[in-house]
Amino acid sequence: MIKTDICDLLQIEYPIFQGGMAWLGTAELASAVSEAGGLGIIGAGHMPPDIFRNEIHKVKERTNKPFGCNIMLMSPFVKEVMQVVVEERVPVITTGAGNPGVYIPALKEIGTKVIPVVASVLLAKRLLRGGIDAIIAEGTESGGHVGDITTMALLPQVVDAVDVPVIAAGGIADGRGVAAAFALGAHAVQMGTRFVLSEECIAHENYKNAVLKAKDRSTVMTGLTTGHPVRIIENQLAHKYKNLEFSGGSKEELENLGAGTLRKAAIEGDVKEGSVMIGQIAGMLHDVKPCKEIITDIMTEAETVIKNLQTFGK
Protein backbone atom coordinates (compact mmCIF):
# COMPACT_ATOMS: atom_id res chain seq x y z
CA MET A 1 0.00 0.00 0.00
CA ILE A 2 1.23 3.50 -0.86
CA LYS A 3 1.58 5.69 2.24
CA THR A 4 2.99 9.21 2.25
CA ASP A 5 3.63 12.03 4.72
CA ILE A 6 0.18 13.40 3.92
CA CYS A 7 -1.43 10.17 5.12
CA ASP A 8 0.34 10.55 8.46
CA LEU A 9 -0.32 14.29 8.72
CA LEU A 10 -4.06 14.00 8.09
CA GLN A 11 -4.60 10.45 9.40
CA ILE A 12 -6.04 9.19 6.12
CA GLU A 13 -5.56 5.79 4.53
CA TYR A 14 -4.92 6.87 0.93
CA PRO A 15 -3.20 10.02 -0.42
CA ILE A 16 -6.27 11.09 -2.37
CA PHE A 17 -8.22 14.33 -1.89
CA GLN A 18 -11.65 14.96 -3.38
CA GLY A 19 -11.78 18.45 -4.86
CA GLY A 20 -13.99 20.85 -2.91
CA MET A 21 -16.45 21.59 -5.71
CA ALA A 22 -19.16 24.18 -5.11
CA TRP A 23 -22.68 22.68 -5.24
CA LEU A 24 -21.25 19.17 -5.72
CA GLY A 25 -18.87 18.86 -2.77
CA THR A 26 -21.73 17.99 -0.43
CA ALA A 27 -21.82 15.97 2.77
CA GLU A 28 -22.91 12.92 0.78
CA LEU A 29 -19.82 12.98 -1.43
CA ALA A 30 -17.34 14.14 1.21
CA SER A 31 -18.37 11.50 3.73
CA ALA A 32 -18.24 8.75 1.10
CA VAL A 33 -14.69 9.69 0.08
CA SER A 34 -13.55 9.88 3.70
CA GLU A 35 -15.18 6.54 4.51
CA ALA A 36 -13.32 5.06 1.53
CA GLY A 37 -10.01 6.19 3.00
CA GLY A 38 -9.40 9.44 1.15
CA LEU A 39 -10.00 13.02 2.26
CA GLY A 40 -13.56 14.07 1.47
CA ILE A 41 -14.01 17.83 1.18
CA ILE A 42 -17.14 19.96 1.55
CA GLY A 43 -17.16 22.73 -1.07
CA ALA A 44 -18.31 25.79 0.88
CA GLY A 45 -18.48 28.03 -2.19
CA HIS A 46 -20.78 30.89 -1.24
CA MET A 47 -22.76 28.87 1.33
CA PRO A 48 -24.34 30.88 4.16
CA PRO A 49 -22.88 29.80 7.52
CA ASP A 50 -26.00 27.97 8.73
CA ILE A 51 -26.13 25.76 5.63
CA PHE A 52 -22.38 25.20 5.86
CA ARG A 53 -22.67 24.11 9.49
CA ASN A 54 -25.46 21.70 8.57
CA GLU A 55 -23.26 20.08 5.91
CA ILE A 56 -20.52 19.58 8.49
CA HIS A 57 -22.99 17.96 10.88
CA LYS A 58 -24.17 15.61 8.14
CA VAL A 59 -20.60 14.51 7.43
CA LYS A 60 -19.99 13.86 11.12
CA GLU A 61 -23.15 11.75 11.25
CA ARG A 62 -21.95 9.63 8.32
CA THR A 63 -18.31 9.08 9.22
CA ASN A 64 -15.86 9.42 12.07
CA LYS A 65 -12.92 9.68 9.69
CA PRO A 66 -11.08 12.93 8.87
CA PHE A 67 -12.67 15.29 6.36
CA GLY A 68 -12.07 18.77 5.09
CA CYS A 69 -13.79 21.92 3.87
CA ASN A 70 -12.81 24.09 0.92
CA ILE A 71 -13.17 27.77 1.76
CA MET A 72 -13.35 30.44 -0.93
CA LEU A 73 -11.74 33.45 0.69
CA MET A 74 -13.65 35.85 -1.60
CA SER A 75 -16.99 34.55 -0.32
CA PRO A 76 -19.19 37.25 1.25
CA PHE A 77 -19.62 34.88 4.20
CA VAL A 78 -15.95 33.99 4.69
CA LYS A 79 -15.61 35.39 8.23
CA GLU A 80 -18.74 33.63 9.45
CA VAL A 81 -17.79 30.40 7.66
CA MET A 82 -14.32 30.43 9.23
CA GLN A 83 -15.94 30.88 12.63
CA VAL A 84 -18.03 27.78 11.95
CA VAL A 85 -14.84 25.90 11.03
CA VAL A 86 -13.36 26.83 14.41
CA GLU A 87 -16.52 26.05 16.38
CA GLU A 88 -16.98 22.68 14.66
CA ARG A 89 -13.26 21.88 14.86
CA VAL A 90 -13.02 20.87 11.21
CA PRO A 91 -9.87 18.72 10.81
CA VAL A 92 -8.66 20.17 7.49
CA ILE A 93 -9.39 23.17 5.31
CA THR A 94 -8.26 23.89 1.78
CA THR A 95 -8.49 27.49 0.61
CA GLY A 96 -8.71 29.34 -2.68
CA ALA A 97 -9.01 32.89 -4.02
CA GLY A 98 -6.93 34.61 -1.38
CA ASN A 99 -4.52 34.38 1.54
CA PRO A 100 -5.75 32.49 4.63
CA GLY A 101 -3.03 34.02 6.83
CA VAL A 102 -5.34 36.10 9.03
CA TYR A 103 -7.28 32.98 10.03
CA ILE A 104 -4.34 30.63 10.62
CA PRO A 105 -3.66 31.44 14.33
CA ALA A 106 -7.21 30.49 15.36
CA LEU A 107 -7.12 27.40 13.17
CA LYS A 108 -3.75 26.30 14.53
CA GLU A 109 -5.08 26.67 18.06
CA ILE A 110 -7.66 23.91 17.45
CA GLY A 111 -5.36 21.74 15.34
CA THR A 112 -6.97 22.37 11.95
CA LYS A 113 -4.59 21.71 9.07
CA VAL A 114 -4.48 24.55 6.52
CA ILE A 115 -3.79 23.66 2.87
CA PRO A 116 -4.15 26.45 0.28
CA VAL A 117 -4.53 25.91 -3.46
CA VAL A 118 -2.02 27.72 -5.68
CA ALA A 119 -1.51 28.12 -9.41
CA SER A 120 1.98 29.65 -9.32
CA VAL A 121 5.32 29.31 -7.54
CA LEU A 122 5.20 32.94 -6.40
CA LEU A 123 1.92 32.42 -4.59
CA ALA A 124 3.19 29.19 -3.05
CA LYS A 125 6.21 30.99 -1.58
CA ARG A 126 4.07 33.85 -0.30
CA LEU A 127 1.58 31.56 1.45
CA LEU A 128 4.35 29.41 2.92
CA ARG A 129 5.28 32.28 5.23
CA GLY A 130 1.89 32.09 6.93
CA GLY A 131 2.46 28.71 8.56
CA ILE A 132 0.50 26.43 6.24
CA ASP A 133 0.70 22.65 6.67
CA ALA A 134 0.78 21.60 3.00
CA ILE A 135 -0.04 23.09 -0.38
CA ILE A 136 -2.07 22.07 -3.44
CA ALA A 137 -0.45 22.85 -6.79
CA GLU A 138 -3.31 23.04 -9.28
CA GLY A 139 -2.64 23.03 -13.00
CA THR A 140 -4.71 24.63 -15.72
CA GLU A 141 -6.09 21.22 -16.74
CA SER A 142 -8.51 21.41 -13.80
CA GLY A 143 -12.15 22.31 -14.11
CA GLY A 144 -13.54 25.54 -12.70
CA HIS A 145 -11.33 28.45 -11.60
CA VAL A 146 -7.78 27.81 -12.77
CA GLY A 147 -4.42 29.37 -13.56
CA ASP A 148 -2.48 29.12 -16.80
CA ILE A 149 0.37 26.71 -15.98
CA THR A 150 0.04 22.98 -16.60
CA THR A 151 0.34 20.51 -13.75
CA MET A 152 3.41 18.91 -15.36
CA ALA A 153 5.24 22.25 -15.31
CA LEU A 154 3.84 23.70 -12.08
CA LEU A 155 4.09 20.73 -9.73
CA PRO A 156 7.86 20.11 -9.67
CA GLN A 157 8.56 23.84 -9.43
CA VAL A 158 6.30 24.17 -6.39
CA VAL A 159 7.85 21.03 -4.86
CA ASP A 160 11.30 22.60 -5.25
CA ALA A 161 10.15 25.94 -3.82
CA VAL A 162 8.49 24.86 -0.56
CA ASP A 163 9.34 22.69 2.44
CA VAL A 164 5.85 21.32 3.11
CA PRO A 165 4.10 18.39 1.40
CA VAL A 166 2.63 19.22 -2.01
CA ILE A 167 -0.62 17.80 -3.39
CA ALA A 168 -0.98 17.61 -7.18
CA ALA A 169 -4.24 18.68 -8.83
CA GLY A 170 -5.35 18.99 -12.42
CA GLY A 171 -5.47 16.30 -15.09
CA ILE A 172 -5.42 13.32 -12.72
CA ALA A 173 -8.11 10.65 -12.81
CA ASP A 174 -6.42 7.25 -12.67
CA GLY A 175 -3.44 5.38 -11.27
CA ARG A 176 -1.16 6.53 -14.07
CA GLY A 177 -1.75 10.13 -13.08
CA VAL A 178 -1.14 9.34 -9.42
CA ALA A 179 2.16 7.61 -10.24
CA ALA A 180 3.22 10.54 -12.42
CA ALA A 181 2.41 13.01 -9.65
CA PHE A 182 4.50 11.04 -7.17
CA ALA A 183 7.37 10.96 -9.66
CA LEU A 184 7.24 14.77 -9.80
CA GLY A 185 7.45 15.03 -6.02
CA ALA A 186 3.81 15.13 -4.89
CA HIS A 187 2.75 13.50 -1.64
CA ALA A 188 -0.91 13.19 -2.67
CA VAL A 189 -3.32 14.04 -5.46
CA GLN A 190 -6.59 15.94 -5.59
CA MET A 191 -9.29 14.95 -8.08
CA GLY A 192 -12.57 16.69 -8.87
CA THR A 193 -13.83 15.52 -12.25
CA ARG A 194 -13.31 11.84 -11.40
CA PHE A 195 -15.52 12.22 -8.31
CA VAL A 196 -18.25 13.99 -10.29
CA LEU A 197 -18.70 10.58 -11.88
CA SER A 198 -19.29 8.84 -8.56
CA GLU A 199 -22.57 7.35 -7.40
CA GLU A 200 -22.53 9.56 -4.31
CA CYS A 201 -22.15 12.84 -6.21
CA ILE A 202 -25.48 14.70 -6.38
CA ALA A 203 -24.77 16.18 -9.83
CA HIS A 204 -27.79 16.09 -12.14
CA GLU A 205 -27.87 13.14 -14.54
CA ASN A 206 -27.49 15.57 -17.46
CA TYR A 207 -24.33 16.97 -15.86
CA LYS A 208 -22.81 13.52 -15.43
CA ASN A 209 -23.76 12.58 -18.97
CA ALA A 210 -22.05 15.73 -20.26
CA VAL A 211 -18.87 14.61 -18.50
CA LEU A 212 -19.20 11.08 -19.90
CA LYS A 213 -19.61 12.43 -23.44
CA ALA A 214 -16.69 14.86 -23.17
CA LYS A 215 -13.61 14.45 -25.37
CA ASP A 216 -10.08 15.73 -24.99
CA ARG A 217 -10.95 19.10 -26.56
CA SER A 218 -14.45 19.53 -25.12
CA THR A 219 -13.52 22.21 -22.58
CA VAL A 220 -12.70 25.88 -23.09
CA MET A 221 -11.43 28.73 -20.93
CA THR A 222 -13.72 31.66 -20.26
CA GLY A 223 -12.87 34.84 -18.41
CA LEU A 224 -9.34 35.08 -19.76
CA THR A 225 -9.50 38.88 -19.94
CA THR A 226 -10.90 39.23 -16.42
CA GLY A 227 -7.95 37.68 -14.62
CA HIS A 228 -10.20 34.92 -13.27
CA PRO A 229 -10.31 32.22 -15.96
CA VAL A 230 -12.74 29.33 -15.65
CA ARG A 231 -12.59 26.00 -17.48
CA ILE A 232 -16.00 24.68 -18.58
CA ILE A 233 -17.45 22.44 -21.26
CA GLU A 234 -17.93 24.30 -24.53
CA ASN A 235 -21.67 24.97 -24.85
CA GLN A 236 -24.09 27.80 -25.58
CA LEU A 237 -23.16 29.60 -22.35
CA ALA A 238 -19.46 29.41 -23.20
CA HIS A 239 -20.07 30.89 -26.64
CA LYS A 240 -22.22 33.71 -25.24
CA TYR A 241 -19.66 34.49 -22.55
CA LYS A 242 -16.68 34.54 -24.91
CA ASN A 243 -18.58 36.66 -27.45
CA LEU A 244 -19.45 39.19 -24.75
CA GLU A 245 -15.98 39.05 -23.24
CA PHE A 246 -14.17 39.76 -26.51
CA SER A 247 -16.64 42.34 -27.80
CA GLY A 248 -16.02 44.76 -24.96
CA GLY A 249 -18.56 43.54 -22.41
CA SER A 250 -18.22 45.18 -19.01
CA LYS A 251 -17.23 43.34 -15.84
CA GLU A 252 -20.79 43.75 -14.57
CA GLU A 253 -22.28 42.32 -17.77
CA LEU A 254 -19.97 39.31 -17.59
CA GLU A 255 -20.78 38.73 -13.92
CA ASN A 256 -24.50 38.92 -14.62
CA LEU A 257 -24.20 36.42 -17.47
CA GLY A 258 -22.28 33.97 -15.30
CA ALA A 259 -24.34 34.37 -12.13
CA GLY A 260 -26.10 31.18 -11.06
CA THR A 261 -24.94 29.18 -14.06
CA LEU A 262 -23.09 26.49 -12.08
CA ARG A 263 -26.22 25.65 -10.12
CA LYS A 264 -28.24 25.75 -13.34
CA ALA A 265 -26.04 23.00 -14.80
CA ALA A 266 -25.01 20.93 -11.78
CA ILE A 267 -28.34 20.86 -9.93
CA GLU A 268 -31.02 21.80 -12.47
CA GLY A 269 -29.45 19.90 -15.36
CA ASP A 270 -29.33 22.66 -17.98
CA VAL A 271 -26.00 21.76 -19.58
CA LYS A 272 -26.50 24.12 -22.53
CA GLU A 273 -27.03 27.42 -20.72
CA GLY A 274 -25.38 26.31 -17.47
CA SER A 275 -21.72 26.12 -16.49
CA VAL A 276 -20.33 22.57 -16.61
CA MET A 277 -17.05 22.99 -14.73
CA ILE A 278 -14.92 19.94 -15.49
CA GLY A 279 -11.29 19.28 -16.28
CA GLN A 280 -9.57 18.27 -19.49
CA ILE A 281 -9.17 14.73 -18.15
CA ALA A 282 -12.92 14.10 -18.66
CA GLY A 283 -12.25 12.58 -22.07
CA MET A 284 -10.78 9.45 -20.46
CA LEU A 285 -13.67 8.86 -18.04
CA HIS A 286 -16.36 6.42 -19.13
CA ASP A 287 -18.15 5.15 -16.02
CA VAL A 288 -19.91 6.08 -12.79
CA LYS A 289 -18.76 4.12 -9.74
CA PRO A 290 -18.96 4.27 -5.93
CA CYS A 291 -16.26 6.39 -4.30
CA LYS A 292 -14.75 3.37 -2.59
CA GLU A 293 -14.31 1.59 -5.91
CA ILE A 294 -12.85 4.69 -7.53
CA ILE A 295 -10.22 5.06 -4.83
CA THR A 296 -9.25 1.40 -4.53
CA ASP A 297 -9.05 0.97 -8.31
CA ILE A 298 -6.86 4.05 -8.70
CA MET A 299 -4.49 3.12 -5.90
CA THR A 300 -4.19 -0.46 -7.14
CA GLU A 301 -3.36 0.81 -10.62
CA ALA A 302 -0.85 3.32 -9.21
CA GLU A 303 0.98 0.56 -7.36
CA THR A 304 1.10 -1.54 -10.54
CA VAL A 305 2.40 1.36 -12.63
CA ILE A 306 5.13 2.18 -10.11
CA LYS A 307 6.16 -1.47 -9.94
CA ASN A 308 6.27 -1.79 -13.72
CA LEU A 309 8.37 1.36 -14.06
CA GLN A 310 11.09 -0.29 -12.00
CA THR A 311 11.65 -2.76 -14.85
CA PHE A 312 12.67 0.02 -17.25
CA GLY A 313 16.19 0.18 -15.86
CA LYS A 314 16.85 -3.54 -16.08
Give a label for each model feature.
Residues A153-I167, A173-K314:
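Conserved active-site-proximal phosphate/metal-binding subdomains
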